Amino acid sequence: MICSTPKDESRIHQNTLLRSLQRGFTLTEVMTVIAVVGVLLAIIIPSLKSLSDQAAGATELAAARQLSQGYVGYATDTNGELMPGYLSQSPGDEHYEGNYDVQGPDGNLLGGPAKRRWTWRILPYLDDAVDSLFVNEARQYIDQRRGTDGFAYLTSVFPSFGLNGEWIGGMQGSIYGDLHTLGRFTGQCYYAQRLAEVQRPADQLLFGSSRGGGPQGDSDVEGFFFIQSPYYLTTGWRWAEDEDGGPLYEEPLAPSKSGYLSLRIRGKSATSMLDGSTALRSMQELADMRLWTNQAWKPDWVLDLQNP
């Protein structure tokens, strides 16, 4: 009988291991691994997306709150006067653009539409941080245009949030200034001009996640300086309608048919109220006129010029 030596046993073990490695995995083993990996990915990927959505939502809500605080800070500095969403081009008006000095990105004084929009006028109440106007996807859009000739203009048009300027502060010289124009004909003002006029600041919508049509026919941009209420001043519903004339909330909708609101956070818009509170709201929730103006006493409220 020949006894194996330790060296022989080591060689046998190595040969066995080598043959095992050369053999590789069986089809059953490979399929099992693939199935396990698939299950793990099915669990992990939605979780990662959910975490990403939650982070984006938290970022938007924080930015919306900061904007509301800046807006109220302006009102505090002006003895309760609310910041106009758009300045007038008529010298006789109280909020004539010539009465304002508005600094641009390099400290230079702005003129034209970039000056008239609220965007650059609120920056002194946000520590002059242009970046505070842009979050998530909108930050990428504006970062690509820094240092260009059109930066100040594009910044004024496409902040991440739109102001409810039709009912708060007014849109005097804007194409969205129908409510102001109506008041000039009737001799009344239908939008809030001062903090004291807003009786329920916690119910008064100020800013919302927005989107607008891109410049020169480009695709829509996540951001716009203005958001628009669902009902027109006196005639009723003005957002998108279905075939039967009822409200249509299904995306995608043109910005002008959805109040320039963006539902980019899990199908909702990040909103802030005049008191600084914030919430994610759906289109159905934002279709309630009681959020847009304290004058409204029902969801489908419109101005009644016969019984003011």
Model-inferred region functions:
Residues M1-F25:
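N-terminal leader/signal peptides at the extreme start of proteins
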Residues S4, A42, P46, S50, ...:
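Residue-level signal for well-ordered alpha-helical scaffold segments within enzymatic catalytic domains
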Residues P6-K7, H13, E29, V135, ...:
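Intrinsically disordered, low-complexity serine/threonine-rich segments
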Residues S10-I12, L17, S52, D244-G246, ...:
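Intrinsically disordered, low-complexity segments enriched in glycine/proline and serine/threonine
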Residues N15-R19, F25, V39, P124, ...:
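Intrinsic-disorder/low-complexity peptide segments enriched for small residues
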Residues Q22-A62:
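Amphipathic alpha-helical segments typified by the pilin-like N-terminal helix
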Residues E60-P308:
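Short, well-structured segments within or immediately adjacent to enzyme catalytic domains
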